[in-house]
């Protein structure tokens, strides 16, 4: 296998770590020195070799440990995976999409063999070798959506399209940024986005919905979203806020570099063929402040974004109370030099810190 998978945890002792390779390919979300909500959609047509955008579904060094963490979450709370009865066909669509994509994009890790409806799926990293009948739920240990998303990094919202809207009628959600599938199941696009400040007034969600409704099969789209998380915790769900919310009070000037993480979601959108549903994968990436600061451009830019972010957004993203502590740390990595446009680290051209 070409990827060396980490043995790490996203809870309790938090042994999660990013290799130098993972830091350089981290999906830094800020293309300029300021931030404001926007639709920011683009075609998901791949990206630079080695980047998180290269493949349809990114698989990285955290894969095996993330799947172990998902299994723990589901054992404690099975309602993190739900599918309304009319979404079963969409689950099979999603299973096919992920199996075909991963077997084609990572042939050393995954194999899919098809003889009509008789399928054999081999997942080498997780030690899975299953034979089943496509479209026959009785031949799988779980429903099709749950079966495949127990083997796929990131969350998956499966959206039914009807009445010129999108409805969250199925999903696997265990790595979310403070929202609940159990609460949102059955809601439409505007209902589940209701808590987001400022964006509604700007008409962003109206434009976003129009874009999403028109996504065609074979023409997926993507965007980045971000927030902040203290400690490398994947499961920041409302159901477990009593466990993780208090961790925000543990930051000090001495530990903030290691404990404070930028949490970025690579959100992609695929039209499914049989059901016409839209699947919305939400892949979470975590990177500590101290690791981000090894990229001079990102250090300069992150300080400016956090410093100038409107109070409403800093509050919504949950770090308004810790912003002074963040800025005290980040300002040490901002020498005032201009930054190059775009999200890439530009390590060969960006000047080193001069401070």
Predicted regions located by residue number:
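Extended, well-ordered protein cores
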Residues: 1-355
């Amino acid at each position: 296998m070409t990827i060396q998978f980490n043995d790490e945890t996203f809870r309790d002792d938090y042994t999660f770590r990013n290799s130098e390779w993972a830091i350089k390919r981290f999906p830094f979300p800020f293309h300029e020195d300021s931030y404001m909500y926007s639709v920011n959609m683009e075609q998901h047509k791949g990206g630079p070799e080695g980047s998180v955008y290269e493949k349809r579904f990114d698989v990285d060094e955290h894969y095996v440990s993330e799947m172990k963490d998902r299994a723990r979450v589901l054992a404690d709370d099975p309602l993190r995976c739900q599918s309304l009865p009319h979404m079963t066909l969409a689950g099979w669509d999603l299973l096919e999409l992920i199996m075909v994509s991963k077997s084609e994009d990572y042939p050393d890790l995954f194999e899919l063999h098809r003889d009509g409806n008789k399928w054999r799926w081999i997942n080498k990293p997780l030690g899975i070798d299953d034979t089943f009948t496509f479209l026959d739920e009785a031949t799988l240990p779980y429903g099709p959506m749950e079966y495949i998303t127990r083997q796929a990094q990131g969350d998956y919202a499966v959206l039914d399209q009807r009445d010129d809207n999108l409805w969250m009628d199925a999903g696997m959600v265990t790595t979310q940024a403070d929202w609940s599938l159990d609460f949102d199941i059955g809601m439409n696009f505007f209902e589940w986005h209701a808590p987001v400040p400022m964006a509604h007034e700007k008409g962003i969600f109206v434009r976003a919905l129009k874009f999403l409704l028109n996504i065609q099969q074979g023409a997926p789209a993507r965007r980045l979203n971000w927030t902040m998380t203290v400690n490398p915790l994947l499961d920041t769900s409302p159901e477990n806020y009593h466990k993780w919310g208090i961790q925000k009070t543990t930051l000090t000037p001495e530990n903030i570099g290691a404990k404070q993480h930028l949490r970025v979601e690579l959100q992609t959108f695929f039209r499914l063929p049989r059901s016409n549903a839209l699947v919305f994968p939400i892949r979470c990436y975590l990177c500590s402040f101290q690791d981000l600061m090894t990229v001079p451009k990102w250090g300069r830019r992150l300080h400016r974004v956090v410093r100038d972010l409107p109070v409403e957004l800093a509050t919504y993203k949950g770090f308004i109370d810790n912003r002074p502590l963040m800025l005290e740390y980040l300002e040490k990595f901002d020498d005032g030099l201009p930054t190059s446009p775009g999200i890439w680290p530009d390590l060969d051209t960006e000047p080193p810190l001069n401070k």
